[in-house]
Amino acid sequence: MISNLAHVDPSAKIGNNVTIMPFAFVDKNVEIGDDSVIMPYAGLFNGTIIGKRNTIYCNAMIGVEPQDFHYKGEDSKVIIGDDNKIRENVVIARGTYTDGATRIGDGNFIMEKVHICHDVVINNRCVIGIGTIIAGNCFIEDEVIMSNSVVLHQNNRIGTLALIQSGCRVQNKSKGWQR
C-alpha cells in the first residue's frame, strides 16, 4: 500500500507488498524490495537500494549526500540488504565517488539517531546503539554490538563479534572476539 500522501518518484522501483506511509519521500532511482515498510517522514534519496523485509522508521534519511570535501555530485549509492530495522532519525550517507556505496548487510538493527557516514560497510546481524556515529570508510564485520553513543573514527575496522561499550571513542582497529 502506497499512501497518496507520500511522494514516490515515478522512476522508483517498488517491490510487492511494500507499505509507504503518508509523508514519506521516495526519490528517483530508488529501489525498495518486497515486504518492506517505509514509515511517515522517512526519506529515501537518489541511489538508495533496499532489499526485502526492511523497516525504515519515521524521519530516517537514507542516501543523503556525503559530508566529504571529495564529493562533487558523483552518482553513488546506499545499498541495504534484507531484514533490517532502521529506527527513527537515522542518517545514512551514500558513497563519495562514482559507483561508490555505503553498504548495510542483512539482519541489522540500527537504533535511533545513528549517523552512518559515506562509504561505510556494516556486514550482517549487527546492533548499532542509539546516538552512535560511524565516520567515513569504516568496515564493521558480522555480529558486532556497538552500545549507545559510540564514536567510531574514520577508516576503522571492527572485527566479528566485537562488543563496544557505551560512550567509547574508537580510534584504532578492533579485532573482535578472540579465543
Indicate residue ranges for each PLM-predicted region.
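Structural signal for interior beta-strand "rungs" in well-ordered beta-sheet cores
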Residues: 2-178
